Amino acid sequence: MPEAHMQPAKLQTSLPTTDHGSKKPVSCYLPPLSNAHPMCIEVQNAQNCSSAAATLEPSIISDTCFYKPITKDQLSSRSELNTVRLKCLNSLRGWKILNQLSLT
């Protein structure tokens, strides 16, 4: 029996349309990544990233980003807070798509 992550999956999300910023539901059937539509690959990667983060202990999802929110009280200065945010920017690119999926 094939493992669950090897089977095609179906995701439904909303993508912006040209109709005054409205969103139209779109279903993506995800074949193996080599044949998938680029948008579906991006959504699947975001979903896989979130699944991996959910299985980790809730302290660190990478060597620079913390899974728990960092407050100003935990850092010595505003510039240090901004530095942490900048370091996390690249690894959190997929979260925007993930958040859009969870809202639909």
Swiss-Prot record:
Protein name per Swiss-Prot or TrEMBL: Disrupted in renal carcinoma protein 1
Record bears the keyword NADP: no
Involvement in disease: A chromosomal aberration involving DIRC1 is associated with familial clear cell renal carcinoma. Translocation t(2;3)(q33;q21).
Polar residues: bias regions: 10-19
The keyword Transmembrane is assigned to this record: no
Source species: Homo sapiens
Superkingdom of the organism of origin: Eukaryota
Keywords tagged on the record: Chromosomal rearrangement
Location of region: Disordered: 1-23
Tissue expression profile of the protein: Expressed at low steady-state level in adult placenta, testis, ovary, prostate, fetal kidney, spleen and skeletal muscle.
Sections of the chain in a coiled coil: none
Annotated S-S bridges: none
